[in-house]
Curated annotation (Swiss-Prot):
Compartments where located: Mitochondrion
Pfam families noted in UniProt: ATP11
GO biological process: mitochondrial proton-transporting ATP synthase complex assembly
Source taxonomy: Eukaryota, Fungi, Dikarya, Ascomycota, Taphrinomycotina
Gene this chain is encoded by: atp11
Organism of this sequence: Schizosaccharomyces pombe (strain 972 / ATCC 24843) (Fission yeast)
Keywords noted in UniProt: Mitochondrion, Transit peptide
One GO cellular component term: mitochondrion
Chain ranges passing through the membrane: none
Coiled-coil annotated residue ranges, if any: none
Primary localization: mitochondrion
Keyword Transit peptide set for record: yes
Functional summary from the UniProt entry: Essential for the assembly of the mitochondrial F1-F0 complex. May interact with the alpha and/or beta subunits of F1-ATPase.
Top-level lineage group: Eukaryota
InterPro entries the UniProt entry points to: ATP11
Protein name: Protein atp11, mitochondrial
């Protein structure tokens, strides 16, 4: 049976986003301990190790202790490596020349008042047509599925999903839900390695916007998924979207569903979480 979410590949349009909120303490610890790329970690006192002789010479010239000079050098290096503005979601997914708009929510993309009287099938076609392109996925999610997914997202706002990378093993991605208002739910997806290195300055490569303006009237939620093709392929994003459905829309009445919900809970609680089990579920067809 085909998946309920229909996912044509569409076009990336301009949109602004708030900075990523702080995550749970366990999510931060997980990000800092789940990587085999230890050689990428920032080492302390690298300025001193590389430029010791120059530092001593400069310190003598300025009549200043080497430690004081070192602190200044490290501050400048951090400012150069991780400028605050460069890692914001706005810079990564929004064109710098995007025009400002007074429209908000779903009205940024489609006139809600005009489509309210249209049949659901027509709204779905218009939504797809509005989002045609290579760097976006769109979908119309039925009310029952969205409400179940939303309730789980509020219970478990953080999770990790792995993507297969052939002989290199897996590449983990950090999921973070955000709820700016009653009609919107945003899901930000960031490379776990990038989050480990940059923390709150890490920019999401994928942002899923859910608009529930028509939920009660038409029984659907409109989903728009923007992603950066330089960081993730459309196939990878589709795999993530389907995996999100598997876990956040899991049934409470089946063994598979119960195990998936248990994995969501385990990650939130920080106990007995098994990333390899998550990968196994992603390989399953159901």
């Amino acid at each position: 049976m085909l998946p309920i979410w229909k996912l044509p590949v569409n076009h990336l349009l301009c949109h602004s986003f708030k900075s990523i909120p702080r995550t749970s303490a366990y999510a931060v610890r997980f990000a800092h301990h789940t990587s085999n790329n230890d050689d990428l970690e920032v080492k302390k006192n690298t300025v001193y190790e590389r430029y010791e002789r120059k530092l001593k010479s400069k310190a003598e010239e300025l009549h200043m202790p080497v430690t004081n000079l070192l602190k200044k050098g490290q501050t400048k290096e951090r400012e150069h490596v991780i400028p605050k503005k460069s890692f914001s979601a706005k810079k990564s997914l929004v064109g710098q020349n995007a025009k400002k708009s007074d429209l908000s929510g779903l009205n940024r993309y489609i006139d809600v008042e005009k489509i309210k009287e249209l049949p659901t099938s027509t709204i779905e076609k218009l939504w797809r047509a509005r989002n045609i392109g290579d760097d976006i996925l769109s979908a119309c999610i039925p009310k029952e599925i969205y409400e179940k997914m939303l309730s789980r997202a509020r219970m478990y706002p953080y999770f990790v999903l792995p993507l297969p990378r052939g002989d290199k093993g897996i590449e983990s991605h950090f999921l973070q839900w955000n709820f700016p208002n009653k009609n919107e739910a945003h899901l930000l997806v960031t490379s776990l390695l990038e989050y480990k290195l940059k923390g709150s300055y890490a920019a999401p490569h994928t942002i899923m916007l859910h608009f529930a303006d028509l939920l009660n009237l038409k029984g659907i939620t409109l989903m728009r998924c923007q992603f950066e093709p330089k960081k993730l392929s459309a196939n990878d994003v589709q795999l993530l979207v389907l995996a999100i459905q598997k876990f956040y829309n899991a049934s409470e009445n089946t063994p598979l569903g119960k195990e998936r919900l248990a994995l969501l809970a385990a990650f939130s609680k920080g106990a007995d979480f098994d990333l390899h089990k998550v990968a196994t579920h992603m390989d399953m067809l159901e």
